[in-house]
Amino acid sequence: MRSEKVEFSGSQGAVLAARLELPEYEPRAYALFAHCFTCGKDQVAATRISRALTEFGIAVMRFDFTGLGGSGGDFGNTHFSSNVDDLVFADEYLRAHFEAPTLLIGHSLGGAAVLAARHRIPRIRAVATIAAPSAPTMCCTCSGATGRR
């Protein structure tokens, strides 16, 4: 396995920090991993899951959402929709520089974000969530933000 630091522009124009875990040989597939609320790409579980997937030939890019970890931008100006948009920008980066992802993985609020983004990322064949709301609308319902972005 090898690991590369990468950067790409996010939905609000900030530079987002990412790490691409690659298998030793040509990847069979690419995946995007979305971390939990206020976590980051280097969270232990995200790192272990990403590296384990490389053993099965899956390259995984995990990144810090706008304003978190090594990414630029102001976290105070972000919201659920901007996280979903950051995922779409991550997809565009992977498609332009490597290969389109076919798998989305999300933990907690990142899981809700991948569920919301899946229809905007054209080649997705599978979505995996870990401890996530079953639908993005659950986040809004619980917070009282139903009907808002």
What is the predicted function of each stretch?
Residues 41-42, 68-99:
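Catalytic nucleophile-loop/oxyanion-hole region of alpha/beta-hydrolase
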Residues 1-26:
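N-terminal cap/lid segment of alpha/beta-hydrolase-fold proteins
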Residues 28-36:
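Short beta-strand element of the alpha/beta-hydrolase
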Residues 50-72:
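Conserved alpha/beta-hydrolase
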